[in-house]
Regions:
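N-terminal binding-site loop/beta-alpha segment at the start of enzyme catalytic domains
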Residues: 1-82, 148
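Active-site beta-loop-alpha junctions enriched in small/polar residues
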Residues: 21, 58-60, 87-91, 127-130
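Glycine/proline-rich, positively charged
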Residues: 27, 32, 93-150
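Acidic active-site catalytic centers that drive phospho-/nucleotidyl reactions
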Residues: 56, 67, 87, 120-123
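A short linear-motif detector with a strong N-terminal bias
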Residues: 61-65, 86, 104-106
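Hydrophobic positions in alpha-helices of CheY-like receiver
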Residues: 74, 88, 143-146
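Structural motif corresponding to the early beta-alpha repeats
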Residues: 77-101
Length: 150
């Protein structure tokens, strides 16, 4: 497998990444796939054996179901060198603050993602899309706070 430097992060990631939008099959995501735990475990083993070292997911995929399946499949023990990337932005509830890139939403969703993934570390936490309602400074400060808190 070929690996490349991820910006200035110090991380080297495989040129292929395992996308997980098809995990869980809940809500609108049922249209693109409905992989369940046994299949997810097999896929993680296959990509890890091929040298893929980055699993990409998002809190919104199957309403958190994708992250839950990854957490169940890997348990509290990740494969050596496997990195996890997840994202936040889209609605995760009906409340007015259950969406967007506000500090409140990002920190709350990061904590929820950690629980669903059954891990204490997210290697790459990303914004899923621009949020024109939240000042960029607030978003960047929230992300910086998450990095500093570990």
């Amino acid at each position: 497998m070929e690996y490349r430097q991820l910006g200035n992060s110090g991380l080297r990631v495989s040129v292929l990444t395992m996308g997980t939008m098809t995990f869980g099959g809940k809500g609108n995501f049922a249209e693109v796939g409905n992989l369940q735990l046994d299949e997810v475990r097999k896929l993680i083993d296959i990509v890890a054996d091929a040298g893929v070292n980055l699993i990409d997911t998002a809190n919104v995929y199957s309403g958190g179901g994708s992250e839950e399946l990854i957490g169940e499949a890997m348990g509290h023990k990740r494969k050596p060198g496997m990195l996890i990337a997840t994202k936040a932005r889209y609605p995760m509830g009906e409340g007015p603050n259950d969406r967007g890139l506000s500090r409140w939403h990002l920190i709350r969703e990061c904590e929820a993602s950690l629980k669903r993934l059954k891990t204490d570390v997210i290697d790459l936490y990303q914004v899923h899309q621009w949020d024109g309602l939240t000042p960029l400074e607030e978003t960047m400060e929230a992300l910086d706070s998450l990095v500093r808190s570990g």
